[in-house]
């Protein structure tokens, strides 16, 4: 049923329809240069923004705020809270936004390298991370309500379906976690893990090209089963 849900968006390049941000803005890669924002996940977000705007004609807002820095020190303890407050304000000011992407990179054992080949280029593999506001130990996490759990899952499933058709080795799957991760902000909200700390900047940037393609396919409503 997730594949049959209509998540298409009527494109209007005159208004912002996609929002990209980074709860963990300091995430970097194997060959990142210290102090160079373009070598972090924020730089990857810049590249994704450019692809979506120049190749596919969407208007994108990219928030580059450092929600995981406090007084110049890395502190992720309240990053999701800080991000939520900022994103809610942006959404209120831009009601045309339909898609919200929290772009991260994963953390894996140092010997693991999440890479494949796409169009002859080394490309970091991707993972969708979905929060269920539910844990085995306590059941529903009532203080983290999310009215869009099913829509969030449908969005991830449809993206994964498109990936399986066009880039079968690109995706690592969908990871189901117990909390909310600010996915309650929109039905088409996504937490995307692009590669990991063992990938190069180039590999992760390369992954944005196929991701932008499958995102556009889902938003167009094309090639959907059923």
Where do the language-model regions lie?
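Solvent-exposed loop/turn segments at secondary-structure junctions
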Residues: 25-28, 66-70, 105-110, 132-136, ...
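Non-catalytic propeptide/linker segments at domain boundaries
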Residues: 1-22, 30
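Active-site-adjacent substrate-binding region
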Residues: 148-175
């Amino acid at each position: 049923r997730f594949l049959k849900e209509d998540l298409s968006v009527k494109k209007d390049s005159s208004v912002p329809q996609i929002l990209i941000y980074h709860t963990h803005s300091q995430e970097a890669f194997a060959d990142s240069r210290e102090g160079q924002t373009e070598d972090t996940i924020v730089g990857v977000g810049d590249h994704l923004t450019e692809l979506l705007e120049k190749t596919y004609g969407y208007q994108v807002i990219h928030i580059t705020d450092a929600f995981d820095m406090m007084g110049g020190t890395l502190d992720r303890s309240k990053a999701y809270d800080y991000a939520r407050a900022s994103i809610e304000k942006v959404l209120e000011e831009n009601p045309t936004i339909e898609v919200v992407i929290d772009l991260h990179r994963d953390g894996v054992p140092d010997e693991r390298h999440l890479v494949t080949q796409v169009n002859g280029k080394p490309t970091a593999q991707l993972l969708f991370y979905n929060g269920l506001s539910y844990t085995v130990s306590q059941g529903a996490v009532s203080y983290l309500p999310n009215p869009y759990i099913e829509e969030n899952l449908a969005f991830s499933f449809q993206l994964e379906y498109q990936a399986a058709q066009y880039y079968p080795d690109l995706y690592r799957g969908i990871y189901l976690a117990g909390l909310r991760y600010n996915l309650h902000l929109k039905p088409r909200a996504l937490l995307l893990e692009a590669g990991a700390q063992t990938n190069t900047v180039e590999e992760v940037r390369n992954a944005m090209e196929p991701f932008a393609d499958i995102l556009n396919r889902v938003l167009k409503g094309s090639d959907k089963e059923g």
